[in-house]
Each structure stands twice: as C-alpha cells, then as structure tokens.
Design a protein with these regions (language model features):
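C-terminal accessory region of radical SAM enzymes
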Residues: 307-336, 361-388
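Short, acidic, Ser/Thr-enriched surface-loop or helix-capping motifs
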Residues: 356-357
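Short, basic/aromatic recognition patches
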Residues: 333-347
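Radical SAM/AdoMet-radical enzyme domain recognition
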Residues: 136, 154, 165-186, 193-302
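Canonical Radical SAM [4Fe-4S] cluster-binding loop centered on the CxxxCxxC motif
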Residues: 129-167, 178, 367-368
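Short, small/polar residue-rich loop motifs at catalytic or cofactor-binding pockets
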Residues: 347-351, 369
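Long, charge-rich, low-complexity alpha-helical segments
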Residues: 1-10, 55-139, 166
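Acidic, low-complexity/disordered tracts enriched in E/D and polar residues
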Residues: 1-64, 68, 128-130
Length: 388
C-alpha cells in the first residue's frame, strides 16, 4: 500500500527543472531550422531565449524545455516522449505542442517590427524571482548633450571620464559571459560618440539584442541611420520634441524601416492640450510603441487619457526603459507614469536590469545614487551579490 501512495505522489509531483545554464544553437544555412538561438535556463526552470540575436523571449518552464530540445537537435518523437514522461501527458500531445512551439518561433522571426522583448507562457507582470543575472543592461555611453542644451540636465558631475570603446567591449563581453541577453545604449546623447557604430557592431557579434535611446536628430541623416541598421541594431526609442520639426522628420525616416521604433513623449502643461493629436500623428506614422511621462503630478488625468488613446490606436506602451537625459526629458521633472510603471520600476530595478554609467559604475537603475561597483574593474559576482 505505501508503494501506491508513493506512486500517486510521483504522478502529481511537479517535474524537476532542467539544469540551469546557458545553451547555444547555430544552424547550418541549409538546416530545417536555420536560426541562431541562445538559451538561459534559470534554477526555477524558466528561461530566456534570444532568437536570431534580435528578440528576447521570456519562457515558462515548458517552453524553456522545448527550446532546450530544439537547441540540442532532439527529434520531435524524442521530445514528445520526454514531455509525456515528465508532465504525465500523451506522447502525441507533447510532440504536437513542441511542433506548435517551433512554428511560433518561425512566425516571430517573420514578423516585421517585432517587439524586442516578448513573453511566452506568462504575463509581462510576472514578478522577478531569484534570477541568475539581469535580463538587460542599460549602458549610458555618455552624459554629453547636444550643443546649446543646458548641461545641468544630465548628472555630469557623477563621472570623471568616459570609457573607451575597447573598455565598453570588455563590459559587453562580461555581460555576455554571465548571460545578459539585452543591451540598451543611452545617455546623454549616445550618437555624440563617434565610436557608437563600433560598439553596437561588437555587441552584435555576441548575438546580444541591442537598442538605442536617443533624441534621434542624427538619425535624420539616412546614411547614418542605414549604418546603424547594418550594425544589427534591433530597436530604437526616440525622445520626441514635438515643437521641433526635425524631430518629426527623424520619425519619417525610421518608422517605415523594419526596425521596432518606440517614441517617448513627456506631457507638460504646455503641450497637454495637443497631446491627443500628437499621439494620433505618431500612430499614423506607424510608430510601434509609446513611452509616456509627465512633468508634474497635476497631469495625472492627462496621462491616463493618453494611455487610453494610445491603446485604442494600437500603440504598445513601454514603461521600463531608461529615458535619456535631454531637454525634452529633464530628469528633475520626470515622474513615473502610473502605478503599474512605478511597480514595474521598483520590481525590476537592480534585478531585471542594471544601469551602467559612462565611467563603468553600476547602479540598480537610472537616477539612483547607490553604486554597486564598477563593471570594468570589479568581478561580476561582487556586483550582483550587492543588496539592490
């Protein structure tokens, strides 16, 4: 009789997660699944999959196992048997679900302007657990600002120097070695660095997903924009100055391209009346997503109206990107846009993402004063073990 109870306990027990670690797959050009995959499996069985170096997929335990089998090249029949054994389901269903998973990956690859961060199997609001490394590293390449902009907007007094391109490459390599799949390059104005293209291209050689946060004005130069795209840049967010026609011309250049484009808009007392028309104009230009902030708490109702309008127009809302210091987004005035945004930043800061200043110092998030260490000179373990 005890053996029966033991068997029942085994039948209903949750399957033990696969071994945590990093796994890679690079198919031959003529392979049936000719893609590049990097998978990070966490101790709880969930995973992060980088698809073709351009999209980060957050996976629940079952989806992470499917990705593991795909990377290992296991036949569908074997996968079906493994899933059936581990999850007490039929072999046919396990094989069918595995086929549906691989087909979903193919669909994502073929989707234009795909969101660079996608969730399979659970909600974006899933709390951050004891992950082995952040999902994203926000790299402020410089705190310099365009000529004519008040330098007091950016915290230039915090840093004594900017890292060189070679030093940033060492940081990029260190981030890749610990399994960080997503790099954001921000500022200040990152396009003021002449070596930006070199830094972006280097991250692409690792297969990391890269994003650029900028005022965008230099992107109005179509030749420069094409160079950025050729480096492998995966997404861009433009901090919009709605009163500057050149800012709109930038969007006319980049929105038609097959590049996920988000736009940040700060709602102020001066532009709140025209905010609905601004958002409609962005939707008409085929921007993919919208980031919002307000310059004063009294604008909370305007923010909520803007959120609803954006959703109705099909614009995704982005809350967790570190908006560059700029005249259109003075840090002293920016306020988190809504309760969900504040919760997201609180939950994710120092866990899902870290912020690296121009000299390599690491902060839990943009705008915080706690230095966890220096990513160029300190061991990763000493930084990650710091209380965040």
């Amino acid at each position: 009789m005890p053996n029966i109870f033991k068997a029942i306990k085994f039948y209903f027990a949750a399957p033990k997660p696969l071994p945590p670690g990093n796994y890679a797959y690079q198919a031959a050009p003529d392979a049936p699944f000719p893609y590049r995959l990097h998978l990070r499996i966490e101790a709880d069985g969930s995973g992060v999959l980088i698809l073709n170096g351009s999209t980060v997929l957050h996976l629940n335990q079952t989806a992470a196992e499917y990705a593991y089998h795909l990377i290992k090249g296991n036949p569908a029949e074997h996968v079906g048997w493994q899933i059936a054994t581990r999850y007490k389901t039929s072999r046919v269903k396990g094989q069918r679900d595995y086929g549906a998973f691989t087909e979903q990956l193919r669909t994502l690859i073929d989707t234009p302007d795909l969101d660079p961060v996608t969730y399979l199997g659970f909600d974006r609001q899933t709390p951050y657990t004891a992950i082995s490394a952040p999902y994203r590293l926000d790299c402020a390449l410089t705190y310099r600002l365009p000529e004519g902009v008040d330098t007091a907007i950016a915290p230039t007094e915090r840093v004594k120097r900017e890292l060189s391109a070679d030093e940033w490459k060492k940081i990029i390599d260190k981030s890749w070695q610990v399994g960080i799949p997503h790099l954001i390059f921000t500022g200040g104005e990152p396009t003021l660095r002449d070596d930006l293209l070199d830094i972006l291209a280097y991250a692409e050689t690792n297969g990391q997903v890269t994003g650029l946060l900028t005022n965008g004005l230099r992107l109005a130069d179509s030749a420069y924009f094409e160079q950025l795209v050729r480096t492998g840049l995966d997404h861009v967010m433009v901090v919009l100055n709605p009163d500057l026609e050149q800012s709109w011309r930038v969007l006319e250049v980049i929105c038609p391209d097959d590049l996920f484009t988000a736009v940040h808009l700060t709602i102020t007392p001066q532009n709140k009346a025209e905010t609905p028309s601004l958002i409609k104009r962005l939707a008409d230009m085929k921007a993919n997503a919208l980031s919002l902030s307000i310059s004063d708490p009294s604008l909370a109702a305007d923010l909520e109206n803007a959120r609803e309008l954006a959703a109705n127009l099909g614009l995704s809302l982005v809350w967790d990107l570190p908006v560059p210091y700029s005249s259109s987004n003075p840090v002293s005035l920016e306020i988190a846009a809504g309760e969900y945004a504040e919760e997201l930043k609180t939950e994710g800061a120092g866990k899902a993402w870290l912020y690296v200043e121009p000299d390599g110092d690491v902060l839990p998030a943009q705008g915080t004063n706690k230095v966890l260490g220096n990513l160029l000179t300190d061991p990763w373990e000493s930084i990650w073990k710091q209380p965040h």
